[in-house]
Amino acid sequence: MTGRPFRVLFLCTGNSARSQMAEALLNWKGKGRFEAQSAGSRPADRVNAHAIATLEAYHIPWAGRAPRGIDGLEREPWDFVITVCDRAKESCPIFPGQPMLAHWGMLDPAEVEGDEVTKRAAFRDAFLLLSRRIDLLLALPLEKLERMALEARVRAVGDAR
């Protein structure tokens, strides 16, 4: 594709848990090969404390970011736009430059009810699923695949459990 880092936008509804963890993971694991950002269609007031604690537990750099909306991001050039929740997939805006679109649907750990142990486990499980999917993305020979084949492979990553 290009010599510059691949630009990836992770979308969810609140931009408080899944998309924040995905952004942090890809920026950390991608080591300059990828530039990830995240946003939400209806951003929450703050990043979920369990998402922050999970990132910190795995020593993933997290720079005290706040949830943000999609406004303005739909005018930026993206190589990949990846939704991590069904609601974001349904309301995904049109992006210029025909980025590759993929849906990596997963349960929202912020909606899990129960005691603290149960909630922490839900965030850990979501983090580990995102980590596996990002590892699969990183293993793809992105520079060698034609666009259609690449888009199909990135979409298939969303089926990984």
Identify the function of each model-found stretch.
Residues 1-71:
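Conserved active-site segments centered on acidic
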Residues 20-22, 48, 89-94, 113:
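Short glycine-/acidic-enriched loop or helix-start segments at secondary-structure transitions
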Residues 41-43, 88, 144:
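Short histidine/acidic/glycine/proline-rich micro-motifs that form metal-
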Residues 75-77:
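Alpha-helix C-terminal capping/helix-to-coil transition sites in glycosyltransferase folds
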Residues 80:
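Short, Asp-centered acidic motifs that coordinate Mg2+ and/or phosphate
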Residues 83-84, 103:
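Redox-cofactor binding/interface segments in oxidoreductases and associated redox assembly factors
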Residues 92-161:
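Phosphate-binding/catalytic loops
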